[in-house]
Amino acid sequence: MGSPKSHYSLVSYLADITGTTIYVPDYRLGPENKYPAQLEDGVRAFKALINDFNYSSEQITIGGDSAGGNLALITLLKLKEEGTYLPNSLVLLSPWADPAGTGESYNLEMADRDILLGPMIKKVWENNDNLYDGYLNNEDADQNNPLVFPISGNYENCPPIMIQVGTEELLLSDSRTLKEALERDKCIHEYFEWEGMYHVFHIDVNMPETISAFKQIANFLDKYSS
């Protein structure tokens, strides 16, 4: 659903407030392209910044919202698996860390309160579909595979990770479960729940909450920049 065009305002405001250069990869999307196309593109984009644009890995923060947050996490875990360079940090906005939607926040009450994601998810439930149908083939839907379900990942020796999530969104439990994994693995992290906010509220750059959230990100990047 997301694209460089759909996220132009969000990325522009975030780049301005953080004083950074942001590259938005035009990675392959489902349902036309199923997993692992997205993971392949994420790893390729990270390596291109190093090999073609002469960045060091310590200069790179991988970020993403919703499904892009999933991609950021699995890209990190794939790079760790390869034993290659890791990014300086991760910034995750309402990350889709549990594509199966097994957490406690996946319920009709929360769907009614999440004004962005709720209507779409309710249609999925009404049709008795899986949340990941447009992303995964059934043979890839292994909930123990961290390169698909990053809530099952091991984050030991990973770089600092920042998470922002709204309290009124269906994916709230994704972030909470991910936070528990980071605590378990002693991964440096900063976690923020935004009271009353819906899924990826950052898309509305005119809200004061969005500007404040972007300033949180700027502080995080300043703290951990090399």
Describe each region flagged by the PLM.
Residues M1-S226:
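Alpha/beta-hydrolase superfamily serine-hydrolase fold, recognizing
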